Design a protein with these regions (language model features):
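Long, hydrophobic alpha-helical segments that serve as membrane-spanning/inserting helices
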Residues: 162-200
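Divalent metal-dependent catalytic cores for phosphoryl transfer on phosphate-bearing substrates
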Residues: 1-147, 151-156, 160-164
């Protein structure tokens, strides 16, 4: 939430809205929490026993499940876009590759079958939450958190989303994206910077 708010403020968007949208964007994961990596405390991963297409359906359903929960618990409608749009129409790449590897070259395995239903982000704030969500997960997986490596990874991820058309429906400029990337890098580097080691 801090990441999205800081980036939104930096480009003159609504930082508070981006922060609150960040709090609610993944509420759909509450329906099937153990199918999501961040909730798997042990080695057992239920996706190991499932067909990749079924896994994709379960993962992508957290968007529609989120909207159902939001309506049930009277979440303000202004937050619905964050729930619906935080993955846009991006593919669930892990399960796409798993299906390709299991297919023996079957041409029936199509990338578009592994995409979220969308829609793509329609505001600067929902696009920022999309980028913050992607960035945070990817940077956590890195071993080298030096400022240059972090910013390089962030810019690569943003370029991939841009090339995939995810920002076609919102009014982000290239200048905005540069400011967002720099802000993300600064905030994340601050989180991962080496702590001072005190003598015992």
């Amino acid at each position: 939430a801090n990441l999205a708010e800081r980036a939104a403020d930096a480009i003159g968007a609504n930082g508070l809205l981006a922060r609150v949208g960040s709090y609610y964007h993944d509420i759909g994961k509450l329906e099937r929490p153990y199918y999501f990596r961040e909730n798997q405390l042990y080695e057992d991963n239920p996706h190991d026993r499932l067909d990749p297409m079924l896994s994709t359906r379960i993962i992508t359903s957290h968007v529609t499940d989120g909207i159902k929960l939001a309506k049930k618990y009277n979440v303000p409608p202004v937050l619905y876009d964050f729930i619906l749009q935080h993955h846009g129409t991006t593919p669930v790449i892990y399960f796409y590759h798993k299906a390709k590897n299991n297919s023996n070259g079957d041409p029936e395995v199509r990338l578009n079958d592994f995409r979220y239903p969308g829609p793509r982000p329609s505001s600067r704030e929902s696009a920022i939450v999309m980028m913050a969500d992607t960035t945070e997960a990817a940077v956590r997986a890195m071993t080298d958190h030096t400022p240059d490596k972090v910013e390089e990874r962030i810019r690569t991820l943003m370029r991939e989303k841009l090339d995939d058309g995810q920002f076609a429906n919102c009014d982000l400029t290239i200048k905005d994206m540069n400011v967002i990337a720099s802000t993300f890098a600064r905030v994340i580097t601050g989180i991962f910077h080496d702590r001072v080691k005190y003598p015992e």
